[in-house]
Amino acid sequence: RDTGSEKKRLKTPVALNHENEIVSRTLQYVADHVCDKLSVEIVSREVGVSASHLTALFHRQMNISPGEYIRRVKLEESKRLIREGTMNFSQIAAQLNYSTIHHFSRQFKDKFGMSPSEYAKSIQSE
């Protein structure tokens, strides 16, 4: 016996196109606002869907959560700013809207396996 809740609905091209558009708008919004305070709730509101819907779309299309994507974009931007060499780590943390330099440093080390200062030293020796 087949109930409606057990059926997987097939996505029509129009539905897939709409999903792609939401994900594309999300990627663009995060890129344009990398220095702002960003959260799944803020971004989902900006692209006009619920946080849970955005999370489901992101998992389906990108294989990561929107929160993880935001973290990755901010951390990649922090690497760029470190390479640029015009800001200290406190300024970079503030520029990218981290609550504290400790939070920034911890996330950086978790992602890249080295602290921001270790990264800065590694690129100076290249």
What would you call each of these model-derived segments?
Residues 66, 115-116:
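Proline-centered helix-kink/hinge sites
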Residues 53-54, 58, 103-104, 108:
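Short hydrophobic/aromatic patch on the recognition helix
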Residues 1-14, 18, 22-25, 53:
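An amphipathic alpha-helical interaction segment
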Residues 15, 19, 32, 47:
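Residue-level marker of regulatory loop/turn positions in helix-turn-helix DNA-binding domains and
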Residues 28, 32, 37-41, 49, ...:
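Terminal helix-turn-helix DNA-binding modules in bacterial transcription factors
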